Structures are given as C-alpha cells and as structure tokens.
C-alpha cells in the first residue's frame, strides 16, 4: 500500500472527524448548556436576549406569541431546558429546540380542549435516574408522538378516548416500555438498558455478534470491571486468574512491560505462542521489543500495553483455534477480543477516576548470611562471591536486596465523557499513568487521548463509526533480564560480608581523569565483572519515547432488514526514540574498551494498515430454520523500520551526542521488514428451532512469507455443532439450561519471514555483505495446527453457571534451525518436522445473584494442560551432506549455565542447568556451603 494512498486515507478521516464533531456538538451542547437568570418583572423578550448572550442559541418566534408580557425568573447554573420551562410557565407558549434554534409557538391546549383530547406529561429516566434525552413517546396505534427534552420531560395530546390509549416509549440501547394511560395524566417512566435482555449475545471473530447458545466452542466473557477495579499499566496483567485456560506471565521489565499470554499451552518451537489481540473486530499486530540476554540492556514493551483500560467495554476470550479460525494464522494460539466504549445517547455523562497503587516485593529469593566475602571458605576482599570464611554474629551486616529496592507507586487518572442524541453519539477520554518503579531511577509515564463518534444516517440505514487515539509514552530504565546491565544481579549477589551502605555513594571523583568514576570494590571478574547497582541505575540510563496515533473507521449500510454490508479500516503508526548512555568507567566490555563512554541512539517506526469488507446475512425461515452467514475479504499490511547509531565516545567524556562518537568505530545498523496478507473468508451458521446449530468457517490467506514457496496460500476450515437438550426436553426448573458442543479446526501458520529468498545480511566486522544464505530456498511449507474440542455449558439453581471443555491440539511441520553444520557455504539449514501435542481441561464455576439493591458475583476457574513433544526430528534427509538425521534432543538457546532444551517426551519450556556445585565441609559446625 503506497504512501499516497495512506495520505488520502488520513485526509478522509480528518474530514470525517471534523464533520462528525460538528454534528455531535449540536446534540451535546444542548444537553450541557447552562444559564443563570435572576430577573424580576421584565418583558419575556429581555429574558430571551439574556439567554442568547449566555448560549449559542437563537430564538425564532411564531405568530401569536406574546413576548412583551411581564414575567419573573430565578435560576442559577441550571440546564437550558429548565430555564425555558420557567420562562414559559403559566403562559400559552411552548418551545422546541432544533440544532441551534429555539422555536416559540402558541400552545395548542385550547384547540385540544375543543376536540376532547387529553394532555399527558411525564419524564423518562434510566435505571440510574439520569434523564433520557430524545426518547420517542408515541400514542400506540397512531402517528401522534413527541420526544423527551433535555431534562427527560415530555408532554403530548392524546385523542379521545384517552382512558383506553397506551403510550409506547422507546430509545436506542434501551428496552421499549408500554404504559396504559387510564385516568393518569403524569407518568414517571424508567428505561432499562437493552443489554440486560440480550445478555446471551457475545462478540465473536471479526466483531460478529452471535447467540451464546449457537457457539460450538468456548468464549469467556470478561467485563470491564475486571481491568478497571484495580488498574495495571498493562491491563492484560489484570486478567491473570480470571480466564480458564490462559497463563499470563508478567515480564521482568516492570510497570508498562509486556505480558506473555499462553492459551492451551505452547505449540510452536521457533515461532510465537502468544495470543492475538483484536480491537473492535480488527486484529492488531502486537509489536513487541526483543528481550535481552547476557549483555542486553533494553526492556520489553508491547503495543497492547498502550491501551487505556477505561476505554474497554468488555473482553471476549477465545482460547481455542476453532473460535478464532476466521482470523487465520494469527489466531492459532487463541484470541482476545476487546470491545471499546462508544457514546451513549442521553444526558452527557462525565466520569472521573483516580487510582493509586503502591508496590513492594512480595517475595525475594532466599540467601545465606552465614559466610562472608570470598570463595572456598577463604576470605577475599575483592570478590562478588559470598562463600568465604564463616561470619560471627557481630560481623554480619544482615544485608538484604530489599535495601536496594524502593517503594514504587502507580498513579492512574482518567476522565471520560459520553453523550449525544439518538442519531449521533460521542465519546471522549483522556488518561495519565505516572509510575516510579521498585528499582531506583525507573520511571514510566503514559498519556492517552481517545475520541469516537457514531452517527445514524439515511433513516438509520447507514451507520458511520469513526475514532482516533493519540498515545504518548516515556519510560526510563525498564529492567531487562540480562546480566551485566541489570542492577538486580549485583544487588542480589552483593557479598554478605561487605557493608552495602558504602556502595550507595556509587561514584568518586577521579582527580587524574577529572571525572566521577564508578565506586565498586567488588570488582573481580575482569572485563565481565559486575557493576555497582546504583551506577547502572543512574550512569547507564536507558530512555525510550514513543508516540502512537490510531485512526479507525467503519461504515455499515442496511440493504434489507436481514442483510447489510460493512467495511472497516484501521491505520496504526508508532514512532519511537531509544537512547542508552554508558558513562566512562562502566563495564569495559559494554564500553568496547572506551575510556570516555558510549552512546546509542535508535529511531524506529511501526506501521499497521488493515481493511476489510463483509456481507452479513441473518434471516429466519418458517420460524424453524435460521441462517447466519458472513462473507468477506481483508488485507493486512505491517511494516517495521529501525535505524541505530552507536559507538564509543571520541571527544570529551560523557558528552552523549552522535557527533561526539568515534568515527572509526561508529556503527549505523538498519533493520526492518514488511509483511502483507490478503485473505478471503466466510462463516455459515444454520439453526433449527433455536436448539440445534451447525457452524462452519473457512479462510484462505495469501501471505507474503510464502512467496517463492511451493504453496502460495493456505486454507484453514473449522466446523462445530451445538445442541441444547434443555430446549429439546422438559428439564426441571432448577436445571434450566444445558448446552453440549463439539468443534474441530485446522489452522495454518506461515514460516518465519525471509526464508524463501536468498538474503545476505550486512556484517559490521568485515564492513560488507555476508555471501552466505540459508538453505533450503523455495522448499518450505506452512506449519499446521489441528484442534479438537468437546464441552458443555450449564445453568442451574437460580444463579450458578458451569462451563467445562476438553481439548487436544496437535502442531505439525514446524520450521526450526537445529544448528547443523553448513560447511557447504550456507549460513543456516532449516528443517521442517516435529510434532507437539497439547491436551487439557478447562472449567469455570460462577455464581451471580441479585437481591434488591445489591449483587453477588463470584467465579472459580480451573485449567490443566499437558504439553508433550511427540516427535522432534525423525529420519530427515540432509541434501547437503546426503545424511539421514534423527534427533530426540535439541538445544534452542541458553542464558549462562541455563539451557533451553527440547527432548522427545519432554515439554516446551524445559530448562536445564549445567552449573557445577562445589561442596565444602565446615568442620566447626558441620555445615555444607555451596559454591
């Protein structure tokens, strides 16, 4: 998708934003405009002039209205509607507000009295007592009607005989109400939100609303309260323990760091097993910064962490591949569907939220304090080890890593605004997250701004939904999981025989070099020695700044009552700047032996563009059969570019600027990638008597990763059946709902990018291009996951719900690099083999009951998953060496002495330690020390 097209889309969204803002202002201002009038014995015209001065409204007076009559009015900071009612009280004048005008006309009471009609009035409110503005009030069976005003009030003439007539009150988003008039002339009407009636409707793939009883797979609903009651900077962490079958692990990066969500076990050897995030039916590529190893220093962040939890209406969690098959390969590991809030018609509502959280470590590793600084039972004054001579009680400093950590806090403040008319609703929110971490000099700040406008046009046949978000994030020293740039390592390993208070003054003036130098007596280890943890925090700062903007637009056109066509588009761009400053006297390996420091500056850009169009059909035949069909196409285009400049400082020490770098050692690596997937999909559901449902879906992807491969695209189907015995048979009243379901799905996943064409990376060590490439070229096939699921859903004893599922997922044809010898001139050799199986059970038991004015809601979840490597590599033929290879063991990666090893019969994620343990007997007290 070229830049010109993207620019046109941006201009189009800007135009829609301005137009929708203008329309929404008419309705919103009418509900919020307030006036103050304290006028006695003045002409009505004078009151009208004062209202025009205090608001942006103008009066239009019809013939017969006496604006010269004397009135008195006394209102202070009241809505415009109340002031107008006070102005016309006791007169034969009535008013009506339309856009920016207030129309005054002669009341029709006198005429009504002559024809025998009756005037009735009332007020329309919601369940919270808030006036409902613009509610339709109609005399049933006639065309006589009106709308409720700014304060929810209404009045109209009911033709004779009024005693037998009925009022029909309706408003979008609420259940309609019918009341009989009888002899009553005033009515207080309460409208309930329609969600209370359609609670069995859930959001599924592509934002499609489906009846819960028709689903052949597990979809767990999570309300917004789950992520807003106790807020986390990354709302995903708030879902831990609330979704059966999902394991949520927080990263080591602290506040704002990424969260790893694994549903139903790890499946792929070399590719991600993380969940897909979908916002308002549109999938989002979750850009995640790479984690660090021994020498890394950059923490991990992700795109989903930018989201404001107060913007979330609900979350639907699909743990199985069948549930998310319409999203294709991205959803092979499950999907989390997020529905955001939109404006609600009625009086403008403003919500202010403030949340403060204090943080202290819940538990730290256990450390020994009996042995002092040194090794093998011998004292040493310049080592990081704590296995020296035994310490007597007086020589123990009782140091704990908690002495290095501080009490952290997270301050979250947000404001949301919602309102509008029945035809146009607006939503706006802003939020700020400000945090100080547990580690000194660790900070995280994020600011969110969101706008959304929904309009019903062309007699409600056309729905236009546009939104925009702008996010600013700044963080400092997000903790990485490495060794030499992680302050926690040296804080944990600080010798128990040394005084930690001495190293808190982490730098000393060096008169010879005329700079402040690192103070760290525990300097054993040469070039790989640890550093003072305070020096890392304050003199190895890592700062990241991100600016992200998102534009989303959707149009739905209603062709008939049972058919509509919808189109959506989303543009999501992020610009980032990352800097790392290593002061002089830092670890010489990290400084590349520079005596003056080192500086890194990295600029990155992430771009996502998504668009789809879909035809939706929902029709019932002969009151027995129901058809729900969806067919559509989509395009997804993701890009990432990053340019770095780094090197040792050549000029004045500790002056961090790219122009101060050593030109002979300065490096400017550039990385990036571009992926595009074009898709065609369908979903077909057939229902019989609302008790038996058969669903099938299909999707075909043309992924750019498959270019120059034998299989240019891949198709993945799913099929499911659900049956409601509680509707087929007469169940006892206390056991009122039972659904049995089964589903099967096959989901494909393309292999990693850049494996189908020869690639030659730039090698900084030789200042040229590497002449080696990977093997094979053009002979790779997609990975495939096949899933079975059986389960049931039950409701009983007036409030209990029970959901249980059994599943099995088998992943085949995995692509990985076994680090085989590539002596024939290839950089890497990739093989496709392997079989990983996940078998498990999910269950959730809930209870929800309402007692008049209070509610009890609780839920218990249970998950069990067995991950097993069935086959790793069996009789794979190596065309380079002409050997047949079989492997039942493969080392994927390592961190120090810890190794990630795959073994047949083992499971994904098994870690093995090869550390040698040295036991030294202490004859004095017969204790054993471990070195």
Please state what every model-predicted region is.
Residues 1-451, 456-457, 462-465, 471, ...:
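Short, small/polar-rich motifs associated with maturation and membrane association
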Residues 197, 213, 273-274, 279, ...:
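Surface-exposed loop/interface segments of Gram-negative outer-membrane beta-barrel transport/assembly proteins
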Residues 236, 249-251, 265-266, 323-325, ...:
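Generic recognition of flexible, low-complexity loop/linker segments
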Residues 258, 312, 333, 693, ...:
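Active-site lining segments that contact anionic ligands and/or coordinate catalytic metals
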Residues 340, 415-421, 451-455, 553-557, ...:
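Residues on the lipid-exposed face of transmembrane beta-strands in outer-membrane beta-barrel proteins
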Residues 708-713:
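Short glycine/threonine-rich loop-to-helix capping motif typified by GTGT followed
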